[in-house]
């Protein structure tokens, strides 16, 4: 549990993020204090200013595959993202999305506002973002690829 005193795990997570990784904080809702503690640990490795911000309605998660109107809030808590190096590096959902996607979904009042179809669409969009975290930077290789194809 990265909320605990396991500093090595937080350091590994920060190293993963710095190397281009993406992670989702799954499970129970993360408090502001939890996110601040995690951010402090990530800051030590990344050596940059990091801040969790609400996911805006025009974010790439809203349109990476399915077109979504909004991400569901729980008790007024919005989904939050951590930007690093010009990309979304971490996501803190306000619901337990994976609980809805299990064979026998377990829901809390927060998850009950979503249908399984809506949860699946959100999950697919998150996967698309996570698999193409820095596709814009990868476009620098496009001229070389096109040259080889000619």
Specify the residue positions occupied by each region the protein language model found:
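Oxidoreductase and adenylate-handling cofactor-binding alpha/beta cores
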Residues: 123-133
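Short loop/turn segments at secondary-structure transitions that flank enzyme active sites
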Residues: 97-99, 132-135
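Short, flexible loop/turn segments with low-complexity composition
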Residues: 136-146
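Detector for methionine-enriched segments
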Residues: 17, 62, 127-128
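Long alpha-helical segments found as membrane-embedded helices
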Residues: 14, 90, 144-150
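An acidic, glycine-rich "communication" segment
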Residues: 26-124, 149
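Helical hinge/lid and interdomain linker segments adjacent to catalytic or ligand-binding clefts
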Residues: 1-37, 93
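Sec-exported extracytoplasmic/periplasmic mature domains
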Residues: 14, 18, 22, 43, ...
């Amino acid at each position: 549990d990265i909320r605990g005193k396991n500093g090595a795990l937080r350091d590994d997570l920060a190293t993963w993020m710095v190397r281009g990784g993406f992670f989702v904080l799954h499970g129970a809702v993360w408090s502001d204090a939890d996110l601040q503690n995690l951010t402090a640990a990530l800051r030590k490795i990344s050596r940059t200013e990091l801040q969790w911000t609400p996911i805006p309605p025009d974010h790439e998660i809203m349109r990476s595959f399915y077109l979504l109107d909004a991400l569901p809030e729980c008790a007024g808590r919005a989904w939050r993202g951590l930007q690093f190096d010009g990309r979304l590096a971490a996501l803190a959902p306000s619901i337990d999305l994976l609980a809805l996607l299990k064979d026998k979904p377990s829901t809390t009042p927060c998850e009950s506002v979503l249908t399984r179809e809506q949860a699946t669409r959100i999950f697919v969009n998150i996967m698309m973002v996570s698999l193409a975290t820095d596709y814009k930077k990868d476009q620098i290789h496009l001229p070389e690829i096109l040259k080889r194809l000619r």
